[in-house]
Amino acid sequence: LLSGPYAVTINGHPALHQRLEARKEALTILYNVYRPHNWTEIVGQEAVVNILKAQVQRKSWGHAYILAGPSGVGKTSIARIFAAALTCAKARAGGPCGKCGSCKAIVSGAHWDVIEYDAASNRGIDEARELARRAFLGPMGPAKVYIIDEAHGLTSPAWDALLKTLEEPPPYLVWAFCTTNPAAIPATV
């Protein structure tokens, strides 16, 4: 898809840019429509789902998780549902209600306490330092969740910048590292 100032004047058609942007938005929305939003929609990951649901029900969870597996198995979806369950005002049976403002904000990608970070694109030390700094800003709700997608893409200096936050996290902070290459995650994590 074309975007930016170059698309505005393609073949002298200023509306082309608007049509392409509308199509891109429609594809993004379609993608999110079919992404699972609650535990019952996750298929083939019953063991992981049961463990995370039980932790939410007991209100006793770890501060860091590595969700590893091939592309398309649901790592990021599981992390998002877990984040929704941890931040949901009306969570029941270890899962998010899907209706409160917190749940809706997660689905739209605009939750104030759930930060999704693409490590494949933002893999450097400066970005990691900013994540670590923001980790100590308290949450507005019961938990703050960092979902690090493609975590294997982080550089060694970036992991070093996150290490102190991982070793001594604030009590409200949960990390979910999603990766297709768990061997690339440092052993110290």
List each model region and its residues.
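P-loop/Walker A NTP-binding region and its immediately flanking N-terminal helices
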Residues: L2-V189
